[in-house]
């Protein structure tokens, strides 16, 4: 009997907060010698698994006696090992032919051919945590990646892609960012809080406890597929110069208003706060337009974002840790703030509108400041104490299969700093030229795509919303003022 690649290990509580699905994307590489590139990638994948064997593992229920119900673990492959790297040759197919985004009716099938696994794991088969598919085109390579999100977060995805690139460069690739020892140490830090949950925080909104997932997930899949037919997915770009100008304008408004200062300190918002708030504002503007009296807006609107906690603990998590080192930020703002209707029930919004009026700014700019400041203030509460409280809360959950993902109107994942475009695959391939994400299936799901290197930097946003809402978003004067809509094949430095 052969020795297993690695010892099975349990997932952390934070891993169990993530829905059981794959995060998938495509990277494209124009290359002159496709056959040489395929060989390079196959060798690189073998090198990667030799150094990081856990990436060949499978997700399964933990069968160790005495563990909590719902505990999941990563197991080494049993029996005949299935390749982590798949290769497909697409005769007479070109990179340009593959770049068109799929129609709503196709449900993303234009991209599915290049991805290694479906969005949902196949429950009647072993569930791999990582797969890559090498698609050999006539004029280049399309790499399709799939990461099981219950095991690997967005920062971890970027780290794995960069280390895969290093392995493809062979001896010249240098040391990996991922250390097997640091993976284990980081998991231990995320398993033990050192105390009870902090009573100042209520974690039920972010991590509600519900009934276990139904055994028949096929019905859930079919519901999502049907819902996806009503969705539209588009890529938008916001030039970084416009983001910086708008951010400085908002921060000036905050500096000009003593009433907005937090305990004597000057408040500020970041570029990410600004981009998220602009999207959130414009979506509610077009979902609940003033001229449509048939639509009654809700009293408030909510957003959820993942926050990287690797540097937020007193004993920081290793930057190369690939597991879920994230907690959820969930923030609600009264709908009147989005619809430019400040009232007595929102003194913060009223102060923003008063300051904007005094400085000669428009009403939507006051709303933007109000929303961005709410996000920034919530982010500032996610410190070491908060993170430890979340970990402790999850330690006390009697059945990990009951931990759910809190419901909000919008879910935003920022991949801005995961470093995918920094991956250098070597002389035959170099850096990725494009990253593409399959069409979304859920209304209100957004990705801020990774930062590119170039002389004309921009923020790229992958937006999935209802078809009618998308039409109104494209026509919204504020959104149109700052964005450029292009298919992913054209999202290049200009």
Curated annotation (Swiss-Prot):
EC number: 2.3.1.-
Region annotated Disordered, chain positions: 181-203
Gene3D superfamilies membership: Chloramphenicol acetyltransferase-like domain
Domain of life of the organism encoding this protein: Eukaryota
Enzymatic class: transferase
Protein family according to the UniProt entry: Belongs to the fumigaclavine B O-acetyltransferase family.
Reported function: O-acetyltransferase; part of the gene cluster that mediates the biosynthesis of the indole diterpenes penitrems. The geranylgeranyl diphosphate (GGPP) synthase ptmG catalyzes the first step in penitrem biosynthesis via conversion of farnesyl pyrophosphate and isopentyl pyrophosphate into geranylgeranyl pyrophosphate (GGPP). Condensation of indole-3-glycerol phosphate with GGPP by the prenyl transferase ptmC then forms 3-geranylgeranylindole (3-GGI).
Subunit structure: Monomer.
Name of the protein: O-acetyltransferase ptmV
Lineage, uppermost ranks: Eukaryota, Fungi, Dikarya, Ascomycota, Pezizomycotina
GN (gene name): ptmV
């Amino acid at each position: 009997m052969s020795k297993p690649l690695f010892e099975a290990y349990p997932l952390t509580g934070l891993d169990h907060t993530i829905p059981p699905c794959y995060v998938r994307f495509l990277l494209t590489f124009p290359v002159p010698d496709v056959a040489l590139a395929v060989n390079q990638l196959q060798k690189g994948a073998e090198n990667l698994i030799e150094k990081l064997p856990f990436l060949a593992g499978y997700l399964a229920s933990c069968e160790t006696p005495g563990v909590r119900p719902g505990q999941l673990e990563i197991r080494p492959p049993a029996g005949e090992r299935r390749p982590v790297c798949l290769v497909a040759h697409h005769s007479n197919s070109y990179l340009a032919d593959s770049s068109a985004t799929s129609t709503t009716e196709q449900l993303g099938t234009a991209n599915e051919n290049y991805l290694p696994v479906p969005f949902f794991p196949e429950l009647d088969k072993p569930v791999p945590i990582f797969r890559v598919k090498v698609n050999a085109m006539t004029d280049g390579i399309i790499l399709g990646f799939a990461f099981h999100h219950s095991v690997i977060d967005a920062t971890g995805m970027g780290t794995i892609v960069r280390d895969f690139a290093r392995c493809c460069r062979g001896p010249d690739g240098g040391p990996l960012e991922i250390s097997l020892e640091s993976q284990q140490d980081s998991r231990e830090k995320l398993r033990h809080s050192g105390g009870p949950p902090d009573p100042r925080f209520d974690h039920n909104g972010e991590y509600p406890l519900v009934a276990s997932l139904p055994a028949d997930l096929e019905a859930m899949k079919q519901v999502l597929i049907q819902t996806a037919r009503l969705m539209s997915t588009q890529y938008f770009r916001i030039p970084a110069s416009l983001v910086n100008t708008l951010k400085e304008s908002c921060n000036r408004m905050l500096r000009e208003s003593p009433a907005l200062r937090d305990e004597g300190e000057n408040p500020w918002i970041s570029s990410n706060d600004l981009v998220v708030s602009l999207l959130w504002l414009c979506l509610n503007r077009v979902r609940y337009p003033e001229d449509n009296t048939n639509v009654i807006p809700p009293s408030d609107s909510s957003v959820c974002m993942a926050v990287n906690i690797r540097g937020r603990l007193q004993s920081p998590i290793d930057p190369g840790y690939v597991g879920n080192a994230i907690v959820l930020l969930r923030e609600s703002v009264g709908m009147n703030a989005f619809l430019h209707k400040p009232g007595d029930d929102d003194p913060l919004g009223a102060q923003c509108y008063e300051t904007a009026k005094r400085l000669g700014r428009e009403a939507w700019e006051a709303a933007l400041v109000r929303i961005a400041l709410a996000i920034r203030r919530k982010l500032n509460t996610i410190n070491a104490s908060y993170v430890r409280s979340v970990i402790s809360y999850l330690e006390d959950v009697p059945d990990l299969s009951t931990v759910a993902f809190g419901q909000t109107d919008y879910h935003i994942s920022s991949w801005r700093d995961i470093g995918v475009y920094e991956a250098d695959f070597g002389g035959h391939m170099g850096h990725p030229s494009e990253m593409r994400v399959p069409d979304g299936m859920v209304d209100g799901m957004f990705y801020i795509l990774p930062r590119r290197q170039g002389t004309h930097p921009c923020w790229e946003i992958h937006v999935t919303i209802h078809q009618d809402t998308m039409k109104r978003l494209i026509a919204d004067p504020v959104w149109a003022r700052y964005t450029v809509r292009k298919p992913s094949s054209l999202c290049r430095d200009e």
